[in-house]
Amino acid sequence: SNDDIVIEGLTRLGYDREDAHNYVVAACWEFIIPGRGMDIPNIDALSFVKAVEDATLDGLENCSSYDEFEALVNENISRQADEICRNTENVHMFPAPFLSLMMEGCVENARDISLGCRYNNYGIHGTGISTAVDSMAAIKKYVFDTEMIDKRILVDALSKNFEGYKAIQMVLRDDAPKFGNNDDYADDIAISLLETFARSLEGRRNDRGGIFRPGTGSAMYYIWHS
């Protein structure tokens, strides 16, 4: 991990700088503070792909510009965020007395870790970012910028899983800009999606007084979000 980025990021999220310097990686890639946090860094996940898919199938034909289409995607992201935050209310945690012995403040306050600690933040994963970006980049380029593909034809092709639309499928798959190739055309879309995701969780508090941390990762959601 990159300390220069991680420490500043954790500090902006409200972690004390001393604690931010002491972060560890929890299992996969999420950041937690050992001994001082009851954070759940992957309590649920938001699907970027679902946000793009719904915007495409339900609204693309009515969009006169890419900005209008992007606004639909952003609305879907915010809607998912609302639902996820509601679903995390009143989550029951089983008591963990042995773990509590090792957490700051639990013994002193006669309080089990399941009831909270210094940090009680929930992390929401954003899944499928590369697929979502690739899809939006293809739509931006071929539907709006070059107008090479009619939006109604694209929606019909998607509804038929490209059966009868092989040529369009090959263009979208092989020629469209792709995320992760140092191509600003696609990468700027990724930045926009992530910023929208972050804004959708900004200022929210869970029922333990913690914040909702946005993050990325598709592990274990390959099937659930497919």
Language-model-derived ranges and their functions:
Residues 1-226:
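Conserved catalytic cores of very large enzyme subunits
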